[in-house]
Amino acid sequence: MIQTISEGEITGIAIVIDSITDIFGIDLRDKVIIIKRLDQELLSNLFDIKGIIVEDGGFLSHTSIFLREANIPCKRIKDATKIYVDGISVELK
C-alpha cells in the first residue's frame, strides 16, 4: 500500500540508503531517495532530488511538514528498501 506524505509525482533513479552518511559525495540530482525513516539530518541534502520513498514516518513529523512546504514528493511504502535497488527507474503518481 502506498501512502502519500507529500503530494507530487516521483520519477527518477533510485538510490537506497541506510543512513545519511551513505549520500555524502553522491550527485543526488534526478535521484529518488529510498530510506527506512525520515530524519531531520536528511533535510539539508534534499533540494536537488526528485522525491523520497520511506518505510516509516509520520505525516505530522517535522521532516514531513518540511517536504510538503518544499514541494518535495514523498510516499510511504512498506518494505521499500527491500523492494527497490540502486539504479532502477522509479515512477510513482
Task: Enumerate the language-model features and the residues they cover.
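Amphipathic alpha-helical
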Residues: M1-S6
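Acidic, glycine-rich flexible loop/linker segments
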Residues: E7-V32, K36-K93
